[in-house]
């Protein structure tokens, strides 16, 4: 089900994955703006994912390098949270700990989050955010 423009108050916080942050620049999608329209007011990124973006900025070239740099600039609007785990598990840990939805285009990560009862969201091909809320 698509998010209902803020009428559902259960989920107000979003943990965002690297692939979504990179997609924002590469595909000119206003993910944060769309999530705000849906009533989300708190955006989290794990320290692990921030480090991953910093490494990508150093190692990538061309558009991807610029996308990583843009994503790091976008993080000025995010809370960086520490987790015990690294990488994808850190996103699941943060979503559980803070009661957030997980926004990712990683199919395996979405599957794992759903198994743990974490609501997920992702970007569709038309650049719109699709949010699957749990009942």
UniProtKB/Swiss-Prot annotation:
The keyword Hydrolase applies. It is an enzyme of class 3 (hydrolase). Its EC number is 3.1.-.-. It holds the Pfam family PIN_9. Its cofactor is Mg(2+). CDD domains: PIN_VapC_AF0591-like. InterPro entries: PIN-like_dom_sf, PIN_9, PIN_dom, VapC_family. GO terms for molecular function: magnesium ion binding; RNA nuclease activity. Residues 15-118 form the PINc domain. Mg(2+) binds at residues 17, 88. The keyword Phosphoprotein does not apply. Keywords: Hydrolase, Magnesium, Metal-binding, Nuclease, Toxin-antitoxin system. Toxic component of a type II toxin-antitoxin (TA) system. An RNase. Dimer. Belongs to the PINc/VapC protein family. This is Ribonuclease VapC9. It comes from Archaeoglobus fulgidus (strain ATCC 49558 / DSM 4304 / JCM 9628 / NBRC 100126 / VC-16). The gene is vapC9.
């Amino acid at each position: 089900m698509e998010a209902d423009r803020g009428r559902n108050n259960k989920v107000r916080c979003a943990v965002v994955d690297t692939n979504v942050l990179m997609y924002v620049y590469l595909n000119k999608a206003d993910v944060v703006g769309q999530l705000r329209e849906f009533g989300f007011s708190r955006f989290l990124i794990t320290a692990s994912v921030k480090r991953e973006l910093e490494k990508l900025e150093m190692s990538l070239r061309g558009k991807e390098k610029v996308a990583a740099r843009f994503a790091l600039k976008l993080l000025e609007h995010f809370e960086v949270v520490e987790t015990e785990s690294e990488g994808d598990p850190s996103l699941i840990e943060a979503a559980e700990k803070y009661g957030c939805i997980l926004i990712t285009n990683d199919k395996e990560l979405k599957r794992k989050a759903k198994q743990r009862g974490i609501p997920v969201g992702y970007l569709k091909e038309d650049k719109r955010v699709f949010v699957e809320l749990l009942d």
